[in-house]
Amino acid sequence: TLARVMAGLLPASQGQVLLDGDELQPALQKRKRSELQKIQFVFQMADTALNPRQRIDHILGRPLGFYLGLKGKEKRRRILELLEMVELPQDFAGRYPEELSGGQKQRVNLARALAAAPEVLLCDEVISALDSIVGANVIELLKRLRKQTGVSFVFISHDLSTVASFADEIV
């Protein structure tokens, strides 16, 4: 519920959402593009979060165009950088989601969120659908990305040991 309120998907029953001291509009539809860019969601089920009819380069390119205004070669370069950031080969840009494993899809889901250059990533049970080895690898990737990008994470999980291994603070 907290993540959905932060993202503007649900209204808060009371209070307000502040980011860097500025109040965010409660409803997603009323947020400005700059507000939308600041908070990105990484959903639990990458299968349903990725459009099966679009190639990975299109999925990653859409937020690059929408939020950052990138086009052409600059957009292509950034798509390849994003794939590298989430430790996927560059040739994945030409693939469709159905050609990827669950862990690879979740990495694409993460890359799509990072494409917006957000301040906060809302990670809702991002490893619960993955086996333990793949999930552990994704957690290590998230730790590296946090150091590399400086993005803050709201990490939601029912597995407290996973949360403890990742979090600076647990609420």
What is each model feature region?
Residues 117:
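Conserved catalytic motifs of ABC-family nucleotide-binding domains
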Residues 7:
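Helix-to-loop junction immediately C-terminal to a conserved catalytic motif
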Residues 96-100, 104:
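Conserved ABC ATPase signature
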Residues 163-165:
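A short, surface-exposed alpha-helical micro-motif characterized by mixed small hydrophobic
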Residues 24-40, 58, 66:
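ABC ATPase NBD coupling module
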Residues 73-91:
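Conserved ABC ATPase "signature" region
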